C-alpha cells in the first residue's frame, strides 16, 4: 500500500506521511476473536510506574492472532484484511472450510479470496505455514517459532522477514533482519513471505499529538531535569550532563552491552554485532 502526503493546510499536516489504508476492511473486528484491553499507564500490579512515558491513548480491543498455525491441512480463505491497533502489521481474517474463523498476520502479496493452508507438505506461497524442515533453502519467511508448538516469535513486525539459508543436523539456519544467523529446530513452524505494511518505517507523525493518540507521552531528557530527578540533571545553563550517559538509576546506557543469556548463545552462529562484510 502506498504512502499518503497532505497539503499543509495546518502545521501538523506539513510533515505528515501516513500509510494509505483505504484497501483495508472498514468495519469492526470479529467479536468472538477480540477481548477488552484495559490501559495500564506503564504501571505494574503494585501501581508503580515500571515503563516511563506511557499513558492515555485511544481505546483498543485486543485481537486474538493465531501465531501457532497448527490447524493442519485445512484450507482457509482470506475473508478480509484488517488494521490492528496493537501491532504494526496488518492482519487477515481466515475462514476455514469447517467454518472456523481465525486472524493471522497478513504477509505481503496476500489478497482477499486467496487460500492459505498449514501442513507438513504444502505449497511455498505467501500465507502458508509449514515446518522449517519442509521448506526449500532460500525461502523468505516470517512468524518463526523458536520452540516447536510455542507459536511464532521472530519476524512479526511490519515489513520484517527471515531467510532460511541452510540446514545442519536437524536444525535450520536462519538469517534475521538484524544480520544475525541462528539455529532453530527444523520442527518449528514458520509462515511463508514477508510481513505486510513494509512502508511503516517511512511514516511521519507530523505532530506530537499523534504519538499521544497511541498512548506515548513526552519523553523527557535527563539533562532537562533537576538533580533530584536524574543523574544528568541540574547545572547552570545548558549542560551536556557531565558524565557518560546513564539511566535515571545510574546504570550505564547508550551502547553498554546488557545481554547475559548464555543459555541461547550456542544457537547464535553469527552475532548481529559482527561487522557486515
Curated annotation (Swiss-Prot):
It comes from the Bacteria. InterPro entries: NA-bd_OB-fold, Rib_uL2_dom2, Ribosomal_uL2, Ribosomal_uL2_bac/org-type, Ribosomal_uL2_C, Ribosomal_uL2_CS, Ribosomal_uL2_dom3, Ribosomal_uL2_RNA-bd_dom. Pfam families: Ribosomal_L2 (PF00181), Ribosomal_L2_C (PF03947). One of the primary rRNA binding proteins. Required for association of the 30S and 50S subunits to form the 70S ribosome, for tRNA binding and peptide bond formation. It has been suggested to have peptidyltransferase activity; this is somewhat controversial. Makes several contacts with the 16S rRNA in the 70S ribosome. HAMAP family: Ribosomal_uL2_B. The gene is rplB. The keyword Ribonucleoprotein applies. Part of the 50S ribosomal subunit. Forms a bridge to the 30S subunit in the 70S ribosome. Belongs to the universal ribosomal protein uL2 family. GO terms for molecular function: rRNA binding; structural constituent of ribosome; transferase activity. This is Large ribosomal subunit protein uL2.
Amino acid at each position: 500500500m502506498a504512502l499518503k502526503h497532505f497539503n499543509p493546510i495546518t502545521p501538523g499536516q506539513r510533515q505528515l506521511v501516513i500509510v494509505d489504508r483505504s484497501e483495508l476492511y472498514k468495519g469492526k473486528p470479529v467479536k468472538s476473536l477480540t477481548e477488552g484491553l484495559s490501559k495500564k499507564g506503564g504501571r505494574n500490579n503494585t501501581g508503580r510506574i515500571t515503563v516511563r512515558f506511557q499513558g492515555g491513548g485511544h481505546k483498543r480491543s485486543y485481537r486474538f492472532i493465531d501465531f501457532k498455525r497448527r490447524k493442519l491441512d485445512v484450507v482457509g480463505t482470506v475473508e478480509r484484511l484488517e488494521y490492528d491497533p496493537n501491532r504494526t502489521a496488518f492482519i487477515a481474517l481466515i475462514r476455514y472450510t469447517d467454518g472456523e474463523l481465525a486472524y493471522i498476520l497478513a504477509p505481503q502479496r496476500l489478497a482477499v479470496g486467496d487460500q492459505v493452508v498449514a501442513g507438513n507438505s504444502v505449497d511455498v506461497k505467501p500465507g502458508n505455514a509449514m515446518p522449517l524442515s519442509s521448506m526449500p533453502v532460500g525461502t523468505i519467511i516470517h512468524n518463526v517459532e523458536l520452540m516447536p508448538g510455542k507459536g511464532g516469535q521472530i519476524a512479526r513486525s511490519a515489513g520484517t522477514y527471515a531467510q532460511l539459508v541452510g540446514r545442519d543436523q536437524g536444525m535450520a539456519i536462519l538469517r534475521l533482519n538484524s544480520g544475525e544467523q541462528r539455529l532453530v529446530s527444523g520442527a518449528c513452524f514458520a509462515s511463508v513471505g514477508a510481513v505486510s505494511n513494509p512502508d511503516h518505517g517511512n511514516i511521519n507523525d507530523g505532530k506530537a499529538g499523534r504519538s499521544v493518540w497511541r498512548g506515548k507521552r513526552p519523553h523527557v531528557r535527563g539533562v532537562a531535569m533537576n538533580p533530584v530527578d536524574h543523574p544528568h540533571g541540574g547545572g547552570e545553563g545548558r549542560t551536556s550532563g557531565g558524565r557518560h550517559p546513564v539511566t535515571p538509576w545510574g546504570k550505564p546506557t547508550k551502547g553498554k552491552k546488557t545481554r547475559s543469556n548464555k543459555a541461547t548463545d550456542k544457537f547464535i552462529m553469527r552475532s548481529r554485532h559482527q561487522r557486515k562484510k
